[in-house]
């Protein structure tokens, strides 16, 4: 018989839910076992990773920070939409960590970087953010990552947060797991183009909302296009499968 328990922790007048043994990043709140007591601490630095042992540098009240080696649980805020503890910053862009199956083009955070065979050495840097080139097997999720390296460890998919798409610094970036409500900002302008139609002229349009059943995103061009049509409706499934590229248009400073 397998017994599944949810662990809830009250810490500094807030309630958190323990989400398992994920790889921590700077800023995460963790629950640790220290001096025969359970304590909450904020991760200041991930010092070193050796196999499954993780060394943390955490503050303890007013005392200086110290190294910690042992078991821990990542704590996520419970009972609110506050995403703290789920946020990861990579290349100056905020991402939300989500539990999802990776697709080609996704960015992932490798939770077991010791399983990354980079030139015969362990991947030393945290967080270990890499892009998925393609999925080798669907059942056990063996991924081929950028630079042709395979990975079969635990991971979380990274989603751009708060309407900001990341700079296209990666080769395969399509971000098929994008949450529409997070990515598209009502009234903002976007450039729409089709990677499968090289002859298509990119469209500049304003996002005006979703259709009633939320299966289409509606963009309006304030000027008529060649067909005399001002509106463009894009099927959400087409966005998720990479049939359209959408880039936010950001005004220059002072405009």
Curated annotation (Swiss-Prot):
It comes from the Viruses. This is Putative gene 39 protein. It comes from Bacillus phage SP01.
